Structure formats: C-alpha cells, structure tokens
C-alpha cells in the first residue's frame, strides 16, 4: 500500500507540473479579438510558379489588395538587415548556396525568388508597402540562442502604425517579447516534430508538447493543422481558452 501511495503521489505531482508547464498567459492579456476577424495569407498570397512567389513584395501586395492579413518570416543578413525569407538556406527558393546570414543584403540581390523577377525584400520595405492596410503576423526566424534579430526588428515594428503580432518556433524569441514588450500579442509556433520523423531528441519532445509555455506565456499557439490530436495543444485551447491558430490551410474543408 505504501508503494502504491508513493506512485499515486508521484503521478499527481507530475500531472500538476505538466499542467503548469503548458499554461499560457492567463492574466494581463492583450486583446487578440481584432486578429481573429481576418484570414491570413501565409507568406503572402503567393504561387511559386508565378511572378508572385512566397515572401515577395508582389505576394504581399496581392494579399493586401485582396483583403487578407499577411503572415511573413524575418531573419537577419550578414550585415544585420532584417529581410523577409522563410528558409535559413537559399537552396529551395533561390537555388543558391549557403544561408541568408552568410550574405550582406546587397549580395543577396543577385538571387531571384523561384525564378521570378522578385528579389528578397527588406522587412522595412514591406512595412512601408503594407502601411497598416491589413494586420501582420511576423514570424521571427531565430537559430539557436542568437536573439540579435529581436531588438533590431522590434525597433522597426515600434515605429510601424499598423496592427501586428509576433510568433516564433524558437521559445527564446517569444520569451524576449514577454520580457521586453509584454503588451504585444505573442505566439508560440509548434509542430508534431517527432511524428514528422525529421527531428529527434528531448528538445523536440519539449517543443512539440509546449512544455516551455510557462516561460514564454504565449497569447496564442500556432500549430500544424494536420495534428489536432496533440494533447498539449488541445489542453491549451480547451482548458486554458488560449487562442489557437492553424498552419497552413490550403482548403476551406480544413477550417
């Protein structure tokens, strides 16, 4: 009986710890309602086989003209200029070698997006073009523990007059905003990493199951829509009434 009691106590303690670890922001929450009134064009309203490829000025212009909010990705060049580009490497979209961070902004202008006339845009230029017409979801692309993107991009965003929020797969980026600008709507991106098969290890178990929410305290969780069964995601939405976002939906049947 004593052993059974100890086992039950351990189970209860672990369960309590789990619920505390996945808990998103519960108090002093900014209003997320205005963001829920929109549908968002992921990387702009794009088609990589056209002259409006992903994360291009043309794709963002099309999205704004069609009345869609815009989701986009930002990262730093070698000379610390925020540009809009999804992958850390150039290969898939531009056919080039190396990473965005291996090149200065001027050097990146030799590359075209998906064989179109479009080139990698500066984040600053995208902000000027959108000019508050539609809301922005800004994904911060952060490798490992390098948070230098956060203060540089944040300075631009603080001067921007339109509606925006931030999100990141890297919990350190979300944590940075929790500490520096708690007034801003912030989101934790995640995926069923272990089920995808590309990632292994304890880190991806932690990220998949949102076990750092107690550190980042996100206002919303954006999850791969193919995995609605992930328990932590369901609990965040159902138990804690945390705003849920889904990526990337290509058909109305998935809404």
Regions found by a protein language model. Name each.
Residues 2-253:
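Phosphate-group recognition and catalysis centered on beta-loop-alpha active-site segments
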